[in-house]
Design a protein with these regions (language model features):
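Conserved catalytic-core motifs of GNAT/GCN5-like acyltransferases
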Residues: 78, 171, 184, 189-204
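Conserved acyl-donor/pantetheine-binding loop and adjacent beta-alpha core of acyl/acetyltransferases
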Residues: 78-136
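Conserved GNAT acetyl-CoA-binding A-motif
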Residues: 131-133, 160-172
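Active-site rim helix/loop that mediates acceptor-substrate recognition in acyltransferases
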Residues: 36-58, 63, 72
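Conserved acetyl-CoA-binding loop-helix of GNAT-fold acetyltransferases
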Residues: 136, 145-159, 181, 185
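Conserved beta-strand-loop-alpha-helix junction that forms the acyl-donor binding cleft
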Residues: 134-144, 170-180, 196-198
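A short beta-loop-alpha structural element at the N-terminal edge
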Residues: 6-20
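Conserved GNAT-fold acetyl-CoA-binding loop/helix
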Residues: 26-46, 85-93
Length: 218
């Protein structure tokens, strides 16, 4: 495969590639199969808002006519949250149940992990007045560490500035030291760290999620 990679706006024909990359890399570059095997449900939760409701804020990295990575961006996190809660989330859950999710032990372990996370404070809180936009990046194996993440962020950051928004936030794994260093190099600063419980074998392990923020004043 050649080395020429192009960063460009998302197109509708990229949808399946973006969805496949999402579940195949979501666990710090690894597949989500350790936690949940319903790839459609995972892709719906991770990408459907961005591909179907806000495609103009989605950027892809393309090499030899194949999508090798993406940045899902959002200019209005309040709107994204509403769409997720009212439309995407309920539909994804209902369809997963229809495919037999309730009969799999992994589903109940994941649900219990979410419940334990909620008892520890739940999802990280973000000041959406200061950081209304957000982003998430995933790259295929073999295309990390080549400057593609930097280029994707720079394209999205220009979009945010052109719209006059004050800042961007992102949520990442607390234990992803490489990813955290990258975001810090890109000018993002740590805003908060929140406990996270995940299934591990027949038990659970405690880790964390971290929130990083960037403003045009930083």
């Amino acid at each position: 495969m050649g080395d020429d990679v192009v960063i460009r706006p998302y197109r509708t024909e990229d949808r399946e590639a973006v969805r496949e990359i999402s579940w195949n890399t979501a666990d710090q570059g690894r597949t989500v199969d350790l936690y949940f095997h319903d790839h459609k449900a995972v892709a719906d939760i991770l990408t459907q808002y961005y591909t179907d409701w806000e495609p103009q804020s989605l950027w892809v990295a393309e090499c030899d006519r194949a999508v090798v990575g993406y940045l899902t961006g959002c200019m209005d996190t309040h709107r994204c949250n509403r769409v997720m809660v009212r439309k995407i989330g309920p539909k994804a859950v209902a369809e997963a149940i229809g495919r037999g999710a309730l009969w799999r032990a992994e589903t109940w372990r994941l649900a219990l992990a979410f419940a334990r996370t909620a008892l520890l404070g739940g999802a990280p809180k973000v000041d959406l007045k200061k950081y209304p936009a957000h982003l998430h990046i995933n790259l295929r194996e073999g295309f990390r560490g080549r400057g593609l993440g930097r280029q994707l962020i720079e394209h999205f950051r220009r979009q945010v500035q052109e719209q006059g928004l004050p800042g961007i936030h992102l949520v990442a794994w607390g234990e992803n030291e490489c990813g955290r260093r990258f975001f810090e190099v890109m000018g993002f600063r740590l805003l908060r760290q929140q406990p996270l419980v995940l299934p591990e074998g027949r038990g659970f392990r405690r880790t964390s999620t971290v929130v990083y923020g960037w403003t045009k004043e930083d």
